[in-house]
């Protein structure tokens, strides 16, 4: 059905055990035959789904997806429009910190970044997780501002910022 399916969407599991790669790639869309197709790693639970032509977007209105409730451990439904990081922002601070670590959680929750922009900073161009130190060295003012808002100045005080060399990956 190449007339209505031209892209595919990465769909990650919404729970505590999802890998950093899958967290960051959740809800990204790619042209058919391109992008990091799941499974990405051993025991990967992510999947891919067809992304219909924009003319069919009305079919996704009101759609839901499964997520594991952090308190009960039971599966439930959440809005299909939520990405992994949108969903994670709705969880309690201790849960977010257990998933991301204290500093990365602060960047997500206090840095003023959208979930989409936060996701784009998590992986390098080979789709490998990036350290906070490496992210902080990127030559982007909004990144430095986010680190300051999150109280993570110690990452910015380290030498090694290379102007223009480090750019966040563009996820579509």
Where in this protein do the model-derived segments appear?
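Activation/maturation switch segments at domain boundaries
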Residues: 1-172
